[in-house]
Amino acid sequence: MTDFSPREIVSELDRFIVGQHDAKRAVAIALRNRWRRLRLEGSMRDEVLPKNILMIGPTGCGKTEISRRLAKMAGAPFLKVEATKFTEIGYVGRDVEQIVRDLVETAISMIKEDKRKLVRAKAELAAEDRILDALVGPGASPPTRDSFRKKLRAGELEDKEIEVEIAQGSGGAMPMFELPNMPGAQIGAMSLGDMFGKAFGKGGKPRRMSVKDAVEPLITEEGDKLMDQDVIVREAIVEVENNGIVFLDEIDKICVREGSRGGADVSREGVQRDLLPLIEGANVPTKHGVVKTDHILFIASGAFHVSKPSDLLPELQGRLPIRVELAPLTEDDFRRILTDTEASLLKQYEALMRTEGVELSFTPDAVNALAKIAAQVNSSVENIGARRLQTVMERVLDEISFSATDRFGEKIEIDAAYVEQHIGDLARNADLSRFIL
């Protein structure tokens, strides 16, 4: 769990996301409160519940990006899901309890990754021994093994083909099966796979591959042998229960509008009802054990173009007490997105062209022109936020991207006149913009 202060979290988010200060503050405080709660003693720790957040704002204003960046910073189990992917329990499809199951799997992967780093040195030695067994045989004399070990460490044997037996599923997740009209059917399928795996020793058939390709799978397999899987699962469940964060995107799409009560609307309302106990706190059975959701933080977000937050079930509104409105992006915001963010679009295109030996640069007036056109098209056609910049940039740089291979060593400067020439007329014609931009 990260121990960043709220100010540090906001500062980190500022590196990648322009504006939306209220939303950044809300998630920063929520994240810090997780850290504060873990430092409380006894019953008080159980009483302090997370204050779930509802982010409201038009598409492309930074809601999902805030969640993506927060996931990288949190150092905690984090899951982003679309509310539209779920159906009411009893209907065909995934039920909302799958959120908790997926969160547990995420936590297990995180903890395994951390523990693999701790045992990597031992795992590398064990993997090296298995590669040597495949190269010279287990009965080879010590001098022969030492000779080949030196060559292996020097990288001289990387292209050599060997036959090794790697357990199925080593380093990867077991395939999951969906059974229609059976809530939680994925668990049954996974458990069945586990049972057969244990019964038959989870052995894999011998595979031929180069030494270079065999190294990582063997290190992963040997590392897994050195870890206690039961301890990992227990730690993962504790981590999910205390630090888990779920980002529920597109929650406005499961709203039931006033006066509308069709078949699909009934199902949407059912998903909301199923979410209530999950957000309030429930015991969810998973293949690894029961998980309590009382202290999982839920951050919901939606554009609410057609519906409004009050169209959500009153009980669900009550379980999302902190509301944050994200402002639509202005021309000035677009300008800052193009220049101020750490991996801005301009830097990305310059780096891409550099791989072809082309030095691409943008003048300040070109940046102003790009921002102005993006804002104009958003206001006249459909406001899709920062995503409009990508469409505009692709259109402006279409010719350069296509011919870059033939222009090695050239220096190309994009100015306002170039932008106007390639996209100006298109942006001014609202009918054309509707279809092309």
UniProtKB/Swiss-Prot annotation:
Record's protein name: ATP-dependent protease ATPase subunit HslU
UniProt-listed NCBIfam families: hslU, PRK05201.1
CC per GO annotation: HslUV protease complex
Pfam families: AAA, AAA_2
Family annotation (SMART domains): AAA, ClpB_D2-small
Role summary: ATPase subunit of a proteasome-like degradation complex; this subunit has chaperone activity. The binding of ATP and its subsequent hydrolysis by HslU are essential for unfolding of protein substrates subsequently hydrolyzed by HslV. HslU recognizes the N-terminal part of its protein substrates and unfolds these before they are guided to HslV for hydrolysis.
Description of how the protein assembles with itself and partners: A double ring-shaped homohexamer of HslV is capped on each side by a ring-shaped HslU homohexamer. The assembly of the HslU/HslV complex is dependent on binding of ATP.
Subcellular localization, as worded in the UniProt entry: Cytoplasm
Entry's family note: Belongs to the ClpX chaperone family. HslU subfamily.
Main localization, broad class: cytoplasm
UniProt KW keywords: ATP-binding, Chaperone, Cytoplasm, Nucleotide-binding, Stress response
Residues the entry annotates as binding ATP: V18, G60, C61, G62, K63, T64, E65, D249, E315, R387
GO biological process entries: protein unfolding; proteolysis involved in protein catabolic process
GO MF annotations, alphabetized: ATP binding; ATP hydrolysis activity; peptidase activity; proteasome-activating activity
